[in-house]
């Protein structure tokens, strides 16, 4: 087995070049992802639909493109949110919006006298969501004690476009962990066997 690797060990410069090329591909992909994250103002600018709760609008495996630069979300808009304490993105439609203007919290304590809260602190928005294919709203999905989603804290982004079925590869990799090993092994083998 080691004798089959001897041509690669005989020329360390070529081996080093292949390793650098592989590192370049990985770092370029990472930079593109981070650049897209900054441009869209979303930690996850691209997500995959994991369930059928949004059918017929989106099918399981659809790849969604998100935008999170709008200060407000409108009723009927499709958003992606994360439940607090869980790391699974949920894609659902906004059914109702509520301005977050607390009744008794309009002033903040500031020493001896009360100080009016700034307008930016009152501009938060509460949202109630529901999957198109679900019978009830998402209050059962939210974190314990949470009745609404907070626009600034919970929303990953609003859906601006999609490509059907492309994301099904990631679902297959999640459901069958052995496929990840096969894919990584294949990629590693291609890097080793590639000659320039």
UniProtKB/Swiss-Prot annotation:
Keywords: Endoplasmic reticulum, Glycoprotein, Hydrolase, Membrane, Protease, Signal-anchor, Transmembrane, Transmembrane helix. It is found in: Endoplasmic reticulum membrane. It catalyses: Cleavage of hydrophobic, N-terminal signal or leader sequences from secreted and periplasmic proteins. Residues 182-193 are annotated as: C-terminal short (CTS) helix. SUPFAM superfamilies: LexA/Signal peptidase (SSF51306). The active site is at 53 (charge relay system), 92 (charge relay system), 138 (charge relay system). It is a single-pass type II membrane protein. GO terms for cellular component: signal peptidase complex. InterPro entries: LexA/Signal_pep-like_sf, Pept_S26A_signal_pept_1_Ser-AS, Peptidase_S26, Peptidase_S26B. Glycans are attached at residue 134. The C-terminal short (CTS) helix is essential for catalytic activity. It may be accommodated as a transmembrane helix in the thinned membrane environment of the complex, similarly to the signal peptide in the complex substrates. This is Signal peptidase complex catalytic subunit SEC11. It comes from Blastomyces gilchristii (strain SLH14081). The gene is SEC11.
């Amino acid at each position: 087995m080691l004798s089959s690797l001897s041509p690669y060990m005989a020329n360390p410069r070529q081996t080093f070049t292949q390793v650098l090329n592989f590192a370049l591909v990985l770092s370029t992909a990472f930079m593109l992802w981070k650049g897209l994250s900054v441009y869209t103002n979303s930690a996850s600018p691209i997500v995959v639909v994991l369930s059928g709760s949004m059918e017929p609008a989106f099918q399981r495996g659809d790849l969604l493109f998100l935008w999170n630069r709008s200060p407000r979300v409108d009723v009927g808009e499709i958003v992606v949110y994360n439940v607090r304490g869980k790391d699974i993105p949920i894609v659902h439609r906004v059914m109702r919006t509520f301005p977050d203007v607390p009744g008794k919290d309009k002033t903040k304590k500031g020493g001896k006298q009360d100080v009016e809260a700034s307008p930016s602190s009152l501009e938060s928005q509460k949202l109630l969501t529901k999957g198109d294919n679900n019978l009830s709203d998402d209050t059962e999905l939210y974190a314990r004690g949470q009745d609404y989603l907070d626009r600034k804290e919970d929303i990953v982004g609003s859906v601006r476009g999609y490509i059907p079925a492309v994301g099904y590869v990631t679902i297959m990799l999640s459901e069958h962990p052995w496929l990840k090993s096969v894919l990584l092994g294949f990629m590693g083998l291609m890097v080793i066997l590639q000659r320039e």
